[in-house]
């Protein structure tokens, strides 16, 4: 009987311990989902200019997307600690109740803080991680993002700023090969593209203003005995300077970036260009040799008790040796009028203009969204939010990229820019459309 009495007591103690541990788990994340319709019929369509790397997102997102983050400080002694962080992401087309999808395992890393006595405040980390990402929320555009599996040492106090060092990887399919048979190369093996990142941040250079400088070097790291296709982009650099100014209860960020060769593709710090394309059974290099210039200004500010404003203006010039580059400029605003601390009206107006280096033709689009929103707070950043919206888009396009896969057109290299002709159309043409719906968005 004494033993039986001890069993409930032991279970109670164990439950208490598990509850305490469970309570220490950090549950964070992001999600968006909704329903929408298109004016001409059918489910909601989303609108993005051909050649533009992003779109204005308010009332213009057609998927359910979620990131579920679980993390916990697993050890702490004084100011030294270890933190384990994970992130699993899901994306579906939001067309049915049951939509099966394979999750993307985006983060799994450990961060050790203050482990080096002579570098107080610094953090050692290793694993898959979203690493110090820089983005424009309004257009969901990441202009400095080397996320992936990696390792690094960050936030080293150098007196006038914080120094961070990191190395990450982004593999590219179909980039390298050894001899397959009869001295013929079969380019199907992925290539490991490495990025080495150095950045100096939090340099106070004026009242309320800080400067961040960064350099990224990317290279294709082919296996021993394997070779890259002739003309592949083997390496490249990206340099970034960003000034952040605190102003009007918000911020303004001014960014200058320059990239070369393998770092020009996405222009955000990931190395690409070692893969190949195939046209008429002939392999050719999908290289990114050339350079990129980007000038960007964006921010979010408060214009009194009743008005908030997001804005962006950007010019980007990707000049490639293959002539497959673009000149893209975009400008947009999103004012918010607050009727009450939890109800607001938003208007988003955005314009994109993309000129093809190969064809000399231009695609353009403007998009307008009006939304009525209920949110948890009186800031333009307040979430969760539930909104109903109506979106109108008008575009005029004259060029596009040749399709790949089953839609490949004979005589046209997939991924290469071509002008529309009377026989073949590569763009969306000249048209307009409108959509409407409801959406929730949350981060926590």
UniProtKB/Swiss-Prot annotation:
InterPro entries: G_neg_Bact_CarbUptk_Porin, Maltoporin, Porin_LamB, Porin_LamB_sf
Signal sequence annotation: 1-24
Catalysed reactions, semicolon-separated: beta-maltose(in) = beta-maltose(out)
Keywords of this entry: Cell outer membrane, Ion transport, Membrane, Porin, Signal, Sugar transport, Transmembrane, Transmembrane beta strand, Transport
Pfam family, one: LamB
SUPFAM superfamilies per record: Porins
Domain of life: Bacteria
UniProt keyword rRNA-binding present: no
Site keyed Important in sugar transport: positions: 142
Chief location bin: membrane
UniProt-annotated site: Greasy slide, important in sugar transport, residues: 30, 65, 98, 251, 381, 443
Cross-referenced CDD domains: Maltoporin-like
Induction info: By maltose.
Cellular component, GO annotation: cell outer membrane; pore complex
Xref: Gene3D superfamilies: Porin, LamB type
Cell compartments where the protein resides: Cell outer membrane
Biological process, per Gene Ontology: monoatomic ion transport
GO molecular function: maltodextrin transmembrane transporter activity; maltose transporting porin activity
Record membrane topology: Multi-pass membrane protein
Listed NCBIfam families: PRK09360.1
Similarity comment text for this entry: Belongs to the porin LamB (TC 1.B.3) family.
Alphabetized HAMAP family for the sequence: LamB (MF_01301)
Subunit structure of this chain's protein: Homotrimer formed of three 18-stranded antiparallel beta-barrels, containing three independent channels.
Role according to the record: Involved in the transport of maltose and maltodextrins.
PANTHER family: CRYPTIC OUTER MEMBRANE PORIN BGLH-RELATED
Protein name: Maltoporin
Native organism: Enterobacter sp. (strain 638)
């Amino acid at each position: 009987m004494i033993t039986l009495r001890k069993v409930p007591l032991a279970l109670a103690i164990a439950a208490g311990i598990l509850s305490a541990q469970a309570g220490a788990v950090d549950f964070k994340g992001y999600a968006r989902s909704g329903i929408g319709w298109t004016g001409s019929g059918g489910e909601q369509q989303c609108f993005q200019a051909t050649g533009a790397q992003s779109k204005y997102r308010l009332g213009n997102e057609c998927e359910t997307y979620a990131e579920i983050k679980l993390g916990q400080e697993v050890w702490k002694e004084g100011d030294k600690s270890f933190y384990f962080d994970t992130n699993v992401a899901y994306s579906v087309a939001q067309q049915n109740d049951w939509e099966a999808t394979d999750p993307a395992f985006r983060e799994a890393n450990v961060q050790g803080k203050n482990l080096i006595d002579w570098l107080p405040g610094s953090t050692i980390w290793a694993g898959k991680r979203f690493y110090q990402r820089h983005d424009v929320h309004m257009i969901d555009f990441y202009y400095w993002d080397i996320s992936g599996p990696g390792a690094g040492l960050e936030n080293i106090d150098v007196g006038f700023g914080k120094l961070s060092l990191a190395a990450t990887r982004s593999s590219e399919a179909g980039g390298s090969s050894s001899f397959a048979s009869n001295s013929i190369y079969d380019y199907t093996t992925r290539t490991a593209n490495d990025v080495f990142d150095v950045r100096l941040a939090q340099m106070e250079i004026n009242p309320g203003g800080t400067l961040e400088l960064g350099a990224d070097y990317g290279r294709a790291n082919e296996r021993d005995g394997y070779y890259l296709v002739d003309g592949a982009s083997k390496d490249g650099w990206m340099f970034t300077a960003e000034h952040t100014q605190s102003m009007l209860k918000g911020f303004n960020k001014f960014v200058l970036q320059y990239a070369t060769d393998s770092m020009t593709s996405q222009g955000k710090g990931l190395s690409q260009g070692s893969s190949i394309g195939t046209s008429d059974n002939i392999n050719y290099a999908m290289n990114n040799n050339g350079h990129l210039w980007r000038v960007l200004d964006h921010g979010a500010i408060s214009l009194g008790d009743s008005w908030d404003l997001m804005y962006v203006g950007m010019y980007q010039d990707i000049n490639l040796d293959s002539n497959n580059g673009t000149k893209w400029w975009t400008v947009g605003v999103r004012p918010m009028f607050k009727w009450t601390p939890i109800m607001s009206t938003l208007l988003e107006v955005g314009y994109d203009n993309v000129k093809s280096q190969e064809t000399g033709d231009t695609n353009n689009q403007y998009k307008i969204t009006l939304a009525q929103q209920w949110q948890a707070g009186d800031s333009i950043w307040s979430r969760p939010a539930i909104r109903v919206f109506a979106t109108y888009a008008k575009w005029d396009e004259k060029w596009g990229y040749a399709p790949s896969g089953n839609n490949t057109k004979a005589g046209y290299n997939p991924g290469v820019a071509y002008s529309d002709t009377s026989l073949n159309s590569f763009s969306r043409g000249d048209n307009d459309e409108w959509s409407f719906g409801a959406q929730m968005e949350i981060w926590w």
